[in-house]
A protein has these predicted regions:
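Divalent metal-cofactor coordination and adjacent catalytic microenvironments
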Residues: 1-102
Length: 102
């Protein structure tokens, strides 16, 4: 997901999660960049393009990735969220396996 193509509803949801109640271009640009970085990171962990608009592991992880990135704490994100990252990978593997057998 490119920073210029962040769905407006995703940007609004992330800002809400971060308790950002104001609107300004600089904040939106920063959060959009963090969302783009987070989706690239999580897509690489998930093995493909993930759905961040639907509730589930990818969306949950993205929200917290952006929170950690905004707070300059990405060095501990993967360690703190390893169990959720693995759960996301397992869920995707099961879903992909089910599609192959159908």
């Amino acid at each position: 997901m490119d920073r210029k193509n962040i769905p407006p509803e995703l940007l609004a949801d992330v800002k809400n999660y971060l308790n950002i109640t104001w609107n300004d271009d600089a904040t939106d640009a920063k959060i959009s960049g963090l969302i783009a970085s987070g989706t690239a990171y999580l897509d690489s962990k998930g093995g493909g393009v993930l759905d961040y608009l639907a509730d589930g592991f990818p969306r949950t992880l993205l929200m917290d990735f952006v929170r950690y990135a905004r707070d300059e704490a990405l060095d501990v994100f993967e360690n703190n969220y390893l169990s959720l990252i693995l759960a996301m990978q397992n869920e995707r593997a099961v879903t992909d396996g089910m599609e192959i057998t159908e």
